[in-house]
Amino acid sequence: MGGYKGIKADGGKVDQAKQLAAKTAKDIEACQKQTQQLAEYIEGSDWEGQFANKVKDVLLIMAKFQEELVQPIADHQKAIDNLSQNLAKYDTLSIKQGLDRVNP
């Protein structure tokens, strides 16, 4: 389990967060597509009536909500990627090296 000197961050946990964020993004997109397809299927089916309309409406609301999660999840992935890249560079920063000389 690699860490980053001077920062309480576990490299393995950061990598795990990157993997989980990517999986979450993929799963949300797949779920949104399936929800949308189910709503469209119900709309085109012979199932009619107030209950069918309510089910379709709920599915459309869910699909819209899932669609609205795509951008925040993408932003989250980008933040984790940036964190990972910046943590890897931390020990090479001149200010960090200067602090190490002052406070070994």
From Swiss-Prot:
GO terms for cellular component: extracellular region. Keywords: Secreted, Virulence. It comes from the Bacteria. It is found in: Secreted. The keyword rRNA-binding does not apply. It holds the Pfam family WXG100. Virulence factor that is important for the establishment of infection in the host. EsxB is required for EsxA synthesis as well as secretion. Mediates together with EsxA the release of S.aureus from the host cell. Also inhibits host cytokine production and thus modulates dendritic cell-mediated immunity. Homodimer. When mixed with EsxA does not form heterodimers. Belongs to the WXG100 family. This is Type VII secretion system extracellular protein B. The lineage of its organism: Bacteria, Bacillati, Bacillota, Bacilli, Bacillales. The gene is esxB.
